[in-house]
C-alpha cells in the first residue's frame, strides 16, 4: 500500500525476508550522496513531519502539538509553529523519521491492525547555510479510504475517523 511504498518492509514487525527500501530511505541516500559533491557543500538538510487528522494539523516531531496553517503576505501557505530539525547524515534523518512515525495516529480496521488514520506529510528542505531555500521535497502518505463495512471496531470514534478520512480524500 501507500505506507509500504514510503517505508519499504523495514518497518514490518517480524519480517525476516530481504529488506526492501522505501521512498524515504532511497531519497535520503540520494540527497546525502549528492551533498558530498563539492558544488553542494554549502547546503544543509532540514526536516519536518506533521499529520492531518480530523481536519487538524499535528506536529509529529514536537509532542503532537496542534499547528495552524496560515497564508503569508506573498500568498504562500506556511504552517505556524512547525518544528524543523537540522540533520547531518542519513542515520540522523532516518531516526527523525522513525520518531515521527511512532507519533502517527493509527487504528484498527478490517484491512489492517495498525492502519494509518491520518495523512502524514514529511518535508525535507535543502537550504544554503545562510538560510536561503534551495529545494524542498514533500512525501505525503495518505490515509486509506474507508468503507464502513471494513471497520472491525464499530465504535463511534472509528466511524467518525473513517468519515473524516473519506471527506478529506474527496477534497483532495
Residue ranges and their predicted role:
Residues 3-171:
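P-loop NTPase "switch/coupling" elements that transmit nucleotide state to mechanical/effector output
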Amino acid at each position: 500500500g501507500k505506507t509500504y511504498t514510503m517505508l519499504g518492509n523495514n518497518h514490518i514487525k517480524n519480517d525476516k525476508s530481504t529488506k526492501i527500501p522505501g521512498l524515504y530511505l532511497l531519497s535520503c541516500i540520494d540527497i546525502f550522496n549528492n551533498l558530498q559533491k563539492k558544488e553542494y557543500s554549502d547546503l544543509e538538510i532540514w526536516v519536518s513531519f506533521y499529520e492531518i487528522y480530523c481536519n487538524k494539523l499535528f506536529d509529529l516531531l514536537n509532542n503532537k502539538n496542534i499547528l495552524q496553517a496560515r497564508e503569508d503576505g506573498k500568498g504562500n501557505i506556511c504552517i505556524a509553529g512547525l518544528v524543523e530539525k537540522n540533520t547531518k547524515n542519513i542515520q540522523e534523518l532516518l531516526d527523525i523519521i522513525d520518531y515521527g512515525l511512532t507519533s502517527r495516529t493509527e487504528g484498527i480496521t478490517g484491512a489492517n491492525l495498525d492502519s494509518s488514520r491520518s495523512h502524514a506529510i514529511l518535508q525535507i528542505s535543502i537550504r544554503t547555510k545562510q538560510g536561503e531555500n534551495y529545494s524542498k521535497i514533500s512525501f505525503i502518505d495518505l490515509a486509506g479510504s474507508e468503507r464502513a463495512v471494513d471497520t472491525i471496531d464499530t465504535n463511534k470514534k472509528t466511524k467518525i475517523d473513517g468519515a473524516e478520512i473519506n471527506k478529506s480524500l474527496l477534497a483532495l
